[in-house]
Curated annotation (Swiss-Prot):
Subcellular location(s) of the protein: Cell membrane
Organism this protein belongs to: Rattus norvegicus (Rat)
Post-translational modification remark: Undergoes proteolytic cleavage by furin protease to yield a 60 kDa soluble form that forms a homotrimer and exhibits a low affinity interaction with heparin.
Compositionally biased region (Low complexity): 129-145, 157-172
Stretches assigned to the Cytoplasmic side: 1-23
Extracellular topological domain: 46-532
Protein name stated in the entry: Collagen alpha-1(XXIII) chain
C-alpha cells in the first residue's frame, strides 16, 4: 500500500521539462516518418513511369523487327528480283544461239565476246522509312565579332529624360555694370532702436512748429471695477510680454477716478504664425518692351549684400505732437498697435524778432537719431552670439522707454471710431494722488550758443548681433537673353564599373554535324569543307 502510494507520488511529481522534451522528440520522429513515406511514394511513382516508358520502347522495337522481313524488306527484295529477271530475259533474246552441230564435230569454243553495254536505269524504289533524329552535335566555336554596321538614319526625337542632378555652382563671374536706378520702394519697416549714444553737445533751441491737427477722440471704454488702493511699488524690471488672458466679464461701473498719467507704450505682440503659402498663379502674357531708360549713376555703393538697405529711403523727421485731449474713463488694455508711419515735416514758419537773452535753460533731452551713414568695412568675425531670449529681453528693454512728463490738457477732440475691444488686463496698483502744480510762465528763447568743440573719437564698438532676415525684394525686370557660352571641356573618364553578375546558362544549340569542319584563323570553316 505504501509502496504503491510512493510510486504514484513519484509519478505525479515528474519534471514538466522532461515531458515537453519527450513530446517534441515524438513529434520530430513522426515528421521524419511521414517525410520518408512521402519520398518512397514519389520514387516509386517515378520508377513506375520510367519502367512503362522502357516497356513501350521495347515493344515498338520488337514490332518493327518482326514487320521488317515480311513488309518493307519483302517489297524491296521483290522489286530487285523482278528487275534482275527482266534484264536477264532481255539479254538472252539478244545473244546468238549456239549452232547445232553434229556430235561428231567437236569444235573448240570461240573467243569470248565483248563486254555488253550497260543496262537501262531501273525504276526508282519505294521511299524508305523516315530516320530518327540524330544526336546533338558538339557546340560550335564562338565566331569573331563582326564589323560595325553602317550608320543608321537619324531617329525620331525621344521622350524627355528624367531631370538630371543639380550641377555644382559655377565660378562667380565678373561684376556687371551698374543697372539703372530702380523705382522708389515702399516705406520700410520701423527699425529697432539702436543703443543709446554718447551725450552730444547741447544744440540750439529750435523754433516752435505749427500745431498739428486735432486727432479723433475715441469712445469711452467700459469702466472697470474699483481696485483696492495699494502701496506704491518700486519700478520693476521690464519683462517679456505675457500671453493675453481670456476676455473677462464686463465689470460694474466704478467711480470716476482722478486723472492718470500717460501710460507706457505696450510691448510689441508676439509674431503670428506664418500663413499658408498661396498657389502659384498662372503666368501672364508677356508685356511689350519698355522704353530705354536714362543713363544711371555710375557711382557704385556697396551695401554689403543688403538690398533692403539700398531700397529704403532716409527716415523722415518726427512730426509735432498734437494737443492732448480731455482724459476719458480708463478703458481696458487694448492690443498693441502696429507702428505708425513717420509724419511729414511741417513747413518752416517765418523767422520771429530777436528776443531778449533769457536765463540759461535746463539741460535738453537727447536728440533724435541721425541719418544712417554709409556702411563701414566688414569687421573681424565676432564670437558666438548670445541666446535669442537675452537678445529679445535687450531689444524689449530698448523699446520700452521711460515715460515723459505729462503734457498740458488740450481741447476735447471729436469722437473717434469704435476701437477693437482688447483682452482685459491685470489690475494695476493704484498710485498716490499727486499735488497739482502751478503752471509757470514761458521763458524767452535764449541766444544761440557757440558751437561746441569736436569731441574725442569714441572707442570702437563691438560688432552688433546679426539682424533678422529682411523681406524679399520686389522682382526686378527680366534681363535680356545672354550670349551662348562656349562648349565646356571634355569631362574625365569615369571609374570603371564593377564586374557584372554571371549570366544564366544558355539554351542548348541546334543539332550539330557528325564531324565539324576545322576552323581557320578567321573563325570560319576551312573552304572546301562541306556536308550534305
Amino acid at each position: 500500500m505504501g509502496a504503491g502510494e510512493r510510486a504514484a507520488g513519484g509519478g505525479g511529481t515528474q519534471d514538466p521539462g522532461a515531458g515537453c522534451g519527450a513530446r517534441a522528440l515524438g513529434a520530430l520522429c513522426l515528421l521524419l516518418s511521414v517525410g520518408s513515406a512521402t519520398a518512397c511514394l514519389l520514387l516509386g511513382a517515378q520508377a513506375a513511369a520510367l519502367h512503362g516508358r522502357v516497356a513501350a520502347l521495347e515493344q515498338e522495337r520488337e514490332l518493327l523487327r518482326r514487320a521488317g522481313p515480311s513488309g518493307a524488306l519483302a517489297a524491296w527484295a521483290e522489286t530487285h528480283l523482278e528487275r534482275l529477271l527482266r534484264e536477264k530475259l532481255d539479254g538472252v533474246a539478244k545473244l546468238r544461239t549456239v549452232r547445232e552441230a553434229p556430235s561428231e564435230c567437236i569444235c573448240p569454243p570461240g573467243p569470248p565476246g565483248r563486254r555488253g553495254k550497260p543496262g537501262r536505269r531501273g525504276d526508282p524504289g519505294p521511299p524508305g522509312q523516315s530516320g530518327r533524329d540524330g544526336y546533338p552535335g558538339p557546340l560550335g566555336l564562338d565566331g569573331k565579332p563582326g564589323l560595325p554596321g553602317p550608320k543608321g538614319e537619324k531617329g525620331a526625337p525621344g521622350d524627355f529624360g528624367p531631370r538630371g542632378a543639380q550641377g555644382q555652382d559655377g565660378a562667380a563671374g565678373p561684376p556687371g555694370p551698374p543697372g539703372p536706378p530702380g523705382a522708389r520702394g515702399p516705406p520700410g519697416d520701423t527699425g529697432k532702436d539702436g543703443p543709446r549714444g554718447a551725450q552730444g553737445p547741447e544744440g540750439p533751441r529750435g523754433e516752435s512748429g505749427q500745431d498739428g491737427e486735432m486727432g479723433p477722440m475715441g469712445p469711452p471704454g467700459p469702466k472697470g471695477e474699483p481696485g483696492t488702493p495699494g502701496k506704491k511699488g518700486d519700478d520693476g524690471i521690464p519683462s517679456q510680454p505675457g500671453l493675453p488672458g481670456p476676455p473677462g466679464p464686463k465689470g460694474e461701473p466704478g467711480d470716476v477716478g482722478p486723472q492718470g498719467e500717460t501710460g507706457v507704450d505696450g510691448a510689441p505682440g508676439l509674431k503670428g504664425e506664418p500663413g499658408h503659402p498661396g498657389t502659384d498663379g498662372a503666368i501672364g502674357p508677356r508685356g511689350p518692351p519698355g522704353l530705354k531708360g536714362e543713363q544711371g549713376d555710375t557711382v557704385v555703393i556697396d551695401y554689403d549684400g543688403r538690398i533692403l538697405d539700398a531700397l529704403k529711403g532716409p527716415p523722415g523727421p518726427q512730426g509735432a505732437p498734437g494737443p492732448p485731449g480731455i482724459p476719458g474713463a480708463k478703458g481696458e488694455l487694448g492690443l498693441p498697435g502696429a507702428p505708425g508711419i513717420d509724419g511729414e515735416k511741417g513747413p518752416k514758419g517765418p523767422k520771429g524778432d530777436p528776443g531778449e537773452p533769457g536765463p540759461a535753460g535746463p539741460k535738453g533731452e537727447t536728440g533724435e537719431m541721425g541719418l544712417s551713414g554709409l556702411p563701414g568695412a566688414d569687421g573681424p568675425k565676432g564670437e558666438k552670439g548670445e541666446s535669442a531670449s537675452d537678445h529679445l529681453q535687450e531689444s524689449l528693454a530698448q523699446i520700452i522707454v521711460e515715460p515723459g512728463p505729462p503734457g498740458p490738457p488740450g481741447p476735447p477732440g471729436p469722437m473717434g471710431l469704435q476701437g477693437i475691444q482688447g483682452p482685459k488686463g491685470l489690475d494695476g496698483a493704484k498710485g498716490e494722488k499727486g499735488a497739482s502744480g502751478e503752471r509757470g510762465p514761458h521763458g524767452l528763447p535764449g541766444p544761440v550758443g557757440p558751437p561746441g568743440l569736436i569731441g574725442l573719437p569714441g572707442t570702437k564698438g563691438e560688432k552688433g548681433r546679426p539682424g533678422e532676415p529682411g523681406l524679399d525684394g520686389f522682382p526686378g525686370p527680366r534681363g535680356e537673353k545672354g550670349d551662348r557660352s562656349e562648349r565646356g571641356e571634355k569631362g574625365e573618364r569615369g571609374v570603371p564599373g564593377r564586374k557584372g553578375v554571371k549570366g544564366q546558362k544558355g539554351e542548348p544549340g541546334p543539332p550539330g554535324l557528325d564531324q565539324p569542319c576545322p576552323v581557320g584563323p578567321d573563325g570560319l570553316p576551312v573552304p572546301g569543307c562541306w556536308h550534305k
